[in-house]
């Protein structure tokens, strides 16, 4: 999505929009799909993917969220969220280059809802269910682990409870 069209023509890869359509076509009928390709393409000149990592930035995730909300008929403005910056971040691509000093570090910023009614539990590495944070303070992590700010990292099992939601959608 973020690669300029003139460079994309020289990459031996299937265009993302075609790959998404092919995957969606293979899914069974009960599966409902939402493509976020167009939502992200509208913002491709912005910082929607990290330079040093394969994940999208919080701003990119917000645009994806807006794409989902549009399909569901709901909306939440970015102004409804608090923004917190956690400083410099270097991701997977940086490690893949053996720490090439030419890489510009990314900046990790997160947007989170202003609510004390959201809680999270997850299964830690020992298999124990523990309390956690949807957005954790990543200042305690090293520069290459800042992404652990989101849901306390990649866990086998996570449950998020939002007491603000009164229907069965949560």
Label every model-predicted segment:
Residues 1-170:
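Extracellular glycan-modifying ectodomains
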